[in-house]
């Protein structure tokens, strides 16, 4: 059994850094006139409730995504990343933190093809319900 559960750490400073880099990479690939495939070897649940028991137990998102969310202005380079956050938190309140597959899907747009893998068996059903996703 795997002991790591990302729901305790979603939206922390390392997650934010990883997802900013991901959004910049996807933006760069989209500039090319060639197709590309998104492969995620640790896709996780896809979306995390920041007010969940797990997230509140560690509170790591308070020093990560919450600090960015509360900023009045951000560098233009973060526009793709922040637009994804706004998409999943359309009420204006920070409630959800999207994982890598949802960030990539939102930035890539249609048509997209995702190949997602996850070792936690209980997270695989959330992976399979994503349209155009191949899950293993």
Question: Where in the sequence are the language-model features?
Answer:
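Class I S-adenosyl-L-methionine-dependent methyltransferase module
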Residues: 36-37, 45-136
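Class I SAM-dependent methyltransferase Rossmann-like catalytic core
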Residues: 1-33, 49-63
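Acidic active-site catalytic centers that drive phospho-/nucleotidyl reactions
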Residues: 18, 40, 118
């Amino acid at each position: 059994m795997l002991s790591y559960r990302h729901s305790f750490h979603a939206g922390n400073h390392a997650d934010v850094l990883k997802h900013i880099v991901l959004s910049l990479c996807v933006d760069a690939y989209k500039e090319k006139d060639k197709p590309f495939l998104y492969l995620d070897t640790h896709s996780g649940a896809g979306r995390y409730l920041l007010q969940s028991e797990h997230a509140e137990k560690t509170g790591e998102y308070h020093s990560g995504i919450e600090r960015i969310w509360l900023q009045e202005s951000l560098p233009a380079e973060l526009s793709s990343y922040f637009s994804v956050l706004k998409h999943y938190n359309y009420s204006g309140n920070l409630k959800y933190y999207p994982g890598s597959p949802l960030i990539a899907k939102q930035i890539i747009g249609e048509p997209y093809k995702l190949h997602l893998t996850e070792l936690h068996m209980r997270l695989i059903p959330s992976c399979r319900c994503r349209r155009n996703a191949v899950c293993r």
